[in-house]
Amino acid sequence: MFSKHPFSTHISGRETPDFGEVFDLDQQVWIFRNQALVTVPRSHRVTPVSVTILPCKYPESLEQDKGIAIYLGIQNPDKCLFCKEVNGHPTLLLKEEKILDLYHHPEPMKPFLFYHTRTGGTSTFESVAFPGHYIASSKTGNPIFLTSKKGEYYNINFNLDIKS
């Protein structure tokens, strides 16, 4: 069962992304390092990236009952997460892209979309382009990545802290 949409889409008559922070169940936050998002232990000396989130404008054209289709980006630098096949494997990458440009595109930009599902207090992010592949984290200092090994070795459950 999915919770109601936690994101606002209309503020002052226009679409505006929500902002927040993400950390995994091991209390590792996402930071931007060497052109990648890596996880490090949460502490007062660490400044996590600010994630930007916007729902897909055309959810009816995507699979239903999978969660809320969202675009997921970061601020400073403005980049968005996307999925593409690299050497035969679905891969999570960052691309210089403005989240509002993706939102206003005349059709869903599937490589940039993730099904966001909330269960209790945690969230999962499943690739729309590669169903069954989830954003995951592992050891400290390693980049976040895509995995199809749901619940085996990697953290696929995250806390998403939306700032108002």
Curated annotation (Swiss-Prot):
N-terminal truncation leads to a dramatic enhancement of its activity (>1000-fold). Proteolytically cleaved by cathepsin CTSG. Residues 1-12 form a propeptide. GO terms for cellular component: cytoplasm; extracellular space. Its main location: cytoplasm. The keyword Cytoplasm applies. GO terms for biological process: inflammatory response; innate immune response; negative regulation of myoblast differentiation; negative regulation of myoblast fusion; positive regulation of cytokine production; positive regulation of interleukin-6 production. Belongs to the IL-1 family. Functions as an agonist of NF-kappa B activation through the orphan IL-1-receptor-related protein 2/IL1RL2. Part of the IL-36 signaling system that is thought to be present in epithelial barriers and to take part in local inflammatory response; similar to the IL-1 system with which it shares the coreceptor IL1RAP. Seems to be involved in skin inflammatory response by acting on keratinocytes, dendritic cells and indirectly on T-cells to drive tissue infiltration, cell maturation and cell proliferation. This is Interleukin-36 gamma. The lineage of its organism: Eukaryota, Metazoa, Chordata, Craniata, Vertebrata.
